[in-house]
């Protein structure tokens, strides 16, 4: 019987592991990956974080290099691996969770390897886990090449011809800009993109966010509610410039697929050769057989990561407590809080 089991060995899970280690608990982290940092290594080749190194570290260990520079995805993958080794955080890799049940005062976790029992369970699968691909993708002809942004690595994966990137977030923007350098590129967004500079003066915009309290704004504060209502901006002006230069053609929200064509909100249509779905991720909780975890809309019920189900915790959710919760720098504060609550507050 473990004191705590953490499901997910990304930055959220190992941040919890850091504080569990300090509290002398008997714990283990389970992850289906073959190595720590695998999810970062598998993302598209050109990915660079828009948070500088000084805002891309976990508790207890700084990311090496120019603190004002932007780290690559491989740099983050290597950092996470080194972090686990330095703090000797116990992780069982190649372990996929099949089901989770609550039995009286403990959780029973069934995996592809064995069964585990634990008093506390932390769900750290994070926001970037299971691709969310709209059902209209099934209405598109088979010969049209489709990928989720998490599967995209480089342009050589695509078929000849144009590409439609669906999704107005930062990943969609970066991928569209990259592809626009070699082929006709369309970007479909629900809303008109809002752009923020990556740098103000010689400082990262996240330095200014930090000093102005934006990163620390809780989801219930006036500032936090305002930011959530506005949605996430596109960081940097590369997309804006590409649209102005007509290298990227902006389209409205996709509402339907019809064989070779995609239909948009303004009733226009477009014949496409490739589609990249930069449509985010969903929480993979279909195997959790516990009542009271989700509300009627399928959202996780929690307060700062503490579930109404005794002994159950969540970490790595967007706006779990504040604006910085889903960022590398911010997840440590949430991890410290839930371990503190686990130990009696």
From Swiss-Prot:
Pfam families: Pyr_redox_3 (PF13738)
First-tier enzyme category under EC: oxidoreductase
EC code: 1.-.-.-
Membrane topology of the entry: Peripheral membrane protein
Tagged with keyword Membrane: yes
Domain of life: Bacteria
UniProt keyword list: Cadmium, Cell membrane, Cobalt, Cobalt transport, Ion transport, Membrane, Oxidoreductase, Potassium, Potassium transport, Transport, Zinc, Zinc transport
Disulphide bonds in the chain: none
Biological processes, Gene Ontology terms: cobalt ion transport; potassium ion transport; zinc ion transport
Gene Ontology molecular function, alphabetical: flavin adenine dinucleotide binding; monooxygenase activity
UniProt subcellular location: Cell membrane
InterPro entries given in the database record: Auxin_biosynth/cation_transpt, FAD/NAD-bd_sf
GO cellular component: plasma membrane
PANTHER family in the record: FLAVIN-BINDING MONOOXYGENASE-LIKE PROTEIN (AFU_ORTHOLOGUE AFUA_4G09220), FLAVIN-CONTAINING MONOOXYGENASE
Function noted in UniProt: Involved in potassium and divalent cation transport. Enhances the transport activity of the cation/potassium transporter CzcD.
Protein name: Uncharacterized oxidoreductase CzcO
Organism the protein comes from: Bacillus velezensis (strain DSM 23117 / BGSC 10A6 / LMG 26770 / FZB42)
The encoding gene: czcO
């Amino acid at each position: 019987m473990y004191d705590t089991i953490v499901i997910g060995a990304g930055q959220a899970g190992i941040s919890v592991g850091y504080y569990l280690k300090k509290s002398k608990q008997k714990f283990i982290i389970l992850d289906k990956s073959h190595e720590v940092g695998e999810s970062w290594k598998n993302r598209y080749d050109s990915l660079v974080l828009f948070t500088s190194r000084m805002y891309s570290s976990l508790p207890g260990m700084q990311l090496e290099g120019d603190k004002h520079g932007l780290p690559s995805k491989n740099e983050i993958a290597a950092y996470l691996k080194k972090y686990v080794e330095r703090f000797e955080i116990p992780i069982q890799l190649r372990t996929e969770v099949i089901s989770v049940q609550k039995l009286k005062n403990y959780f029973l976790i069934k995996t592809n390897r064995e069964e585990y029992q634990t008093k506390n369970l932390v769900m750290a699968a994070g926001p970037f886990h299971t691709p969310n691909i709209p059902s209209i993708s099934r209405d598109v002809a088979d010969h049209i090449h489709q990928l989720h942004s998490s599967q995209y690595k480089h342009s050589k994966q695509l078929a000849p011809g144009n590409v439609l990137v669906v999704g107005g977030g930062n990943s969609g923007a970066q991928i569209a800009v990259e592809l626009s350098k070699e082929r006709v590129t369309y970007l479909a967004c629900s809303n008109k993109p809002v752009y923020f500079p990556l740098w103000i003066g010689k400082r990262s915009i996240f330095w200014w966010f930090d000093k102005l309290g934006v990163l620390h704004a809780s989801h219930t504060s006036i500032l936090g509610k305002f930011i959530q209502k506005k949605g996430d901006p596109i960081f940097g002006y590369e997309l804006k410039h590409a649209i102005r230069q007509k290298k990227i053609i902006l389209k409205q929200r996709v509402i339907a697929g019809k064989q070779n064509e995609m239909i948009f909100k303004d009733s226009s249509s477009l014949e496409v050769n490739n589609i990249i779905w930069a449509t985010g991720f969903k929480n993979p909780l279909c195997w959790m057989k516990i009542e009271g975890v989700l509300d009627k809309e399928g959202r996780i019920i929690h307060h700062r990561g503490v579930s109404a189900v005794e002994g159950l915790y969540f970490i790595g959710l967007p706006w779990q407590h504040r604006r910085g919760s889903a960022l590398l720098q911010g997840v440590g504060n949430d991890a410290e809080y839930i371990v503190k609550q686990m130990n009696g507050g």
